[in-house]
């Protein structure tokens, strides 16, 4: 029976051609940490990471490859982003369907003076974008919203959500 993988919001499978081979080659031929040694393999590893940062910056039209940070997974990435970016007095908007990887750090940040509001969703998983404008505040620093739900299959309207925040000093994830 053919296997059909439907949880790509969790992880990708099968991996793209060459991924397993590249990881194996790195483990077998290099296996060192970058910025931890003054020998050829360490320099090669550092160059590989720099090249990867540059490629990702170009792919996502980023301003500077030094802004690319690698983490183990999206949960860690969200924690680094939210806890590093938000300050006491900041406000965040999140969709009502956000994953615990977003909600847990935001709930923790409430004790540090960060507040958040949930943008309501209808029973079918669609986002109430008209309610979003009413929830925006002068101190809103971020809009955190999944793009596609692996629970109900809804694709949220990222472009539509971005319109009312364009030109404000905040980030949309």
PLM regions with names:
Residues 1-173:
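Pyridoxal 5′-phosphate
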């Amino acid at each position: 029976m053919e296997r059909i993988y439907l949880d790509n919001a969790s992880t990708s499978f099968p991996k793209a051609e060459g991924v397993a081979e590249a990881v194996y080659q790195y483990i077998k031929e290099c296996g060192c940490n970058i910025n931890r040694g003054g020998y050829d393999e360490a320099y090669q590893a550092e160059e590989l990471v720099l090249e990867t940062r540059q490629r990702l910056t170009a792919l996502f039209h980023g301003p500077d490859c030094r802004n690319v940070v690698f983490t183990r997974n999206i949960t860690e990435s969200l924690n680094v982003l939210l806890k590093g970016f938000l300050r006491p007095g900041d406000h965040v908007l999140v969709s009502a369907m956000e994953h615990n990887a977003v909600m847990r750090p935001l709930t923790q940040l409430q004790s540090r003076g960060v507040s958040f509001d949930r943008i309501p969703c209808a029973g079918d998983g669609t986002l109430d974008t008209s309610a979003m404008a009413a929830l925006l505040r002068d101190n809103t620093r971020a809009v955190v919203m999944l793009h596609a739900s692996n629970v109900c299959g809804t694709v949220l309207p990222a472009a539509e959500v971005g319109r009312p925040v364009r030109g404000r000093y905040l980030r949309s994830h």
